[in-house]
Amino acid sequence: MRVKINLKCSSCGSINYLTSKNSKTHPDKIEVLKYCPKERKVTLHLESK
């Protein structure tokens, strides 16, 4: 079953992206390097609900 998750910037705390994941195949939290428009650089984004 796919669930919707938010990706939150680890340095500034803003929620920049909305995505989905399959919780059965990937039960752990997602960590992705994405662009943060508030800081104007690529930062680590963590899964938040």
Curated annotation (Swiss-Prot):
* GO biological process annotation, one example: translation
Which keywords does the record carry? Ribonucleoprotein, Ribosomal protein
Query: Which Pfam families has this protein been placed in?
Result: Ribosomal_L33 (PF00471)
Q: Which family does it belong to?
A: Belongs to the bacterial ribosomal protein bL33 family.
GO terms (molecular function) for this protein are: structural constituent of ribosome
Name listed for the protein in its UniProt record: Large ribosomal subunit protein bL33A
The source organism is Streptococcus pneumoniae serotype 4 (strain ATCC BAA-334 / TIGR4)
What InterPro entries has UniProt attached to this entry? Ribosomal_bL33, Ribosomal_bL33_CS, Ribosomal_bL33_sf, Ribosomal_zn-bd
* GO cellular component terms, semicolon-separated: cytoplasm; ribonucleoprotein complex; ribosome
Q: Does the entry feature the keyword Glycoprotein, yes or no?
A: no
NCBIfam families in UniProt: PRK00504.1 (NF001764), PRK00595.1 (NF001860), rpmG_bact (TIGR01023)
